[in-house]
Amino acid sequence: MAEKVNNFPPLPKFIPLKPCFYQDFEADIPPQHLSMTKRLYYLWMLNSVTLAVNLVGCLAWLIGGGGATNFGLAFLWLILFTPCSYVCWFRPIYKAFKTDSSFSFMAFFFTFMAQLVISIIQAVGIPGWGVCGWIATISFFGTSIGSAVVMLIPTVMFTVMAVFSFIALSMVHKFYRGSGGSLSKAQEEWTTGAWKNPHVQQAAQNAAMGAAQGAMNQPQTQYSATPNYTYSNEM
């Protein structure tokens, strides 16, 4: 088997850094989990874009007469939360769907609930926290309407992010409970060390993908539309 080369994030060649992770949805994720995994990846991308737009909103806030603290914090949140959210909650759910690991599911639930709380706080928008939320935006309309309109864009995006995060958390939790997952199972994986054993992870991945392929390729019994009667020659 060819060695997997890290391919994420895809960095330009002029940057003297190499990708840190290997990511291939079609190769790693079983078909029945592919759609949900990609949706969570798109949610991470939305979060990253929202943080970038928030930086623009805080710049408009600064130009309109707001303090420089918000712009500085917005820049900090962008460079901090973008990689941290990928490592802390997307990689665990990617690994959870890849290897059917209860420990990875629990790691996702713990960190993603924190992400949900952060998204709600960002949508609220407490002044001085480096986010263009509802409180900060509405209160700034009396100072500069133009800046407030620009600030309204990341405010709406933070709100959408919070709603989508709640929906995503509910969907993953419903799937996990429906598949028989539990906290005790995650604790068992932690105790036995199965969550970090590459051989166990590979076996779980192969079993999950094999079951999915078997379900799709299972032949269906064909029945003839014409009845076939067998008569005995004995009277």
From Swiss-Prot:
Residues 61-67, 126-148 are extracellular. One of its GO terms (biological process) is positive regulation of calcium ion-dependent exocytosis. Interacts (via C-terminal part) with SYT1 and SYT2; interaction with synaptotagmins making a link with the SNARE molecules. Interacts with SLC9A7. It is found in: Cell membrane; Golgi apparatus membrane; Golgi apparatus, trans-Golgi network membrane; Recycling endosome membrane. GO terms for cellular component: Golgi membrane; plasma membrane; recycling endosome membrane; synaptic vesicle membrane; trans-Golgi network membrane. It is a multi-pass membrane protein. It comes from Pongo abelii (Sumatran orangutan). Residues 1-39, 89-102, 170-235 are cytoplasmic. Keywords: Cell membrane, Cytoplasmic vesicle, Endosome, Exocytosis, Golgi apparatus, Membrane, Protein transport, Synapse, Transmembrane, Transmembrane helix, Transport. Required for the calcium-dependent exocytosis of signal sequence-containing cytokines such as CCL5. Probably acts in cooperation with the SNARE machinery. The chain crosses the membrane at residues 40-60, 68-88, 103-125, 149-169. This is Secretory carrier-associated membrane protein 5. It holds the Pfam family SCAMP. Its main location: membrane. Belongs to the SCAMP family. SCAMP5 subfamily. InterPro entries: SCAMP (IPR007273).
